[in-house]
Amino acid sequence: MTSKNQLELLHKECRKCIDCSLAETRTNVVVAKGNPDAEILIVGEGPGEQEDITGFPFVGRAGKMLDSALNSVEIDPLEDCYITNIVKCRPPNNRKPSLEEVKSCIPWLDKQIDFLDPKIIVLAGSTAVESFLNIKQPISKIRGEWIEKDDIKVMPIFHPSYLLRNPSKEPGKPKWLTWQDLKKVKKVYDSF
């Protein structure tokens, strides 16, 4: 069985998940979107309202911001990336996922990574960084620096929803810094 077939089976299993209380309030399990053969994996925090409705990650305002940021450095969000979240179900009122919810969901992400075998992982926001890297530092301190995990290059960036709240493109501001971070991702991506 190919990795792609294994990934499809994993996603079918994931859509049936009832391992935490988020299963009681979700509309859809939001597994992933994008190219399963991509070398870039983008991991966010969790689905929002629009994602819960559609069943796909990053389709709301934050998703449009992410697409725009990626396109600005000539990374195609659907062809060059595979996009998922730490938790696959929407936390009520878009709250931060609890530790229990993260612990229930992280095995799904680990299996996705096994099947995808990405060369680069972009972690969008502090929840993704804390959950995946087990690092508790402000995203403002850790973003923009490459971290190695299991021979994969990992780049923490600000979450796109944070950029919506901080829209200035002035040098040194979050949106400008994210653009710099994604240029680093593009440079490494182009080297493969």
Task: Name each model-derived stretch.
Residues M1-F192:
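A polyanion-binding, active-site-adjacent surface
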